């Protein structure tokens, strides 16, 4: 939650999957897609499309929508990101933009596209967030080695 603006709100603890569609359709809300979870959980639940209503701001309008696209690619589902003050963007499960229109230039904006509704299994879907942890570990090893080289160079210079 974003203090102090959302301090009185309570975060959810379950996924929202719409029934009646030919494939599972998830509903995330705005900031949800900025994090690995619940985006990963929707992928593991087999979601083929995630609807992502948002209220993007002028500062983050492009960035925020593109994070949602990345989450769709990571987890194998199409994304419909509908922002009040940003972009209406629809992508397939591989991140290809199927349609995009600005929603902050007129009183009303609409976008109509055909979306392939099929979940694609991904490595991230199956194994989770191991890569960021591995990258962090490799960075730590590199920093330690660099510190050792600097220390050695400093002692040899004396």
Specify the residue positions occupied by each region the protein language model found:
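Enzyme catalytic cores with a strong preference for nitrogen-chemistry domains
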Residues: 1-158
């Amino acid at each position: 939650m974003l203090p102090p603006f959302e301090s009185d709100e309570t975060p959810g603890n379950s996924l929202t999957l719409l029934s009646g569609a030919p494939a599972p359709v998830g509903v995330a809300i705005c900031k949800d897609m900025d994090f690995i979870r619940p985006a990963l959980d929707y992928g593991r639940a087999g979601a083929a499309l995630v609807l992502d209503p948002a209220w993007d701001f002028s500062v983050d309008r492009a960035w925020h929508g593109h994070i949602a696209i990345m989450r769709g690619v990571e987890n194998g589902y199409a994304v419909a990101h509908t922002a009040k003050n940003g972009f209406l963007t629809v992508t397939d499960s591989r991140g290809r933009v199927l349609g995009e229109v600005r929603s902050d230039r007129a009183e009303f904006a609409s976008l109509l596209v055909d979306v392939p509704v099929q979940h694609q299994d991904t490595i991230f879907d199956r194994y989770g967030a191991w890569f960021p942890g591995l990258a962090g570990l490799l960075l730590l090893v590199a920093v330690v080695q660099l510190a050792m080289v600097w220390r050695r160079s400093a002692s040899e210079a004396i």
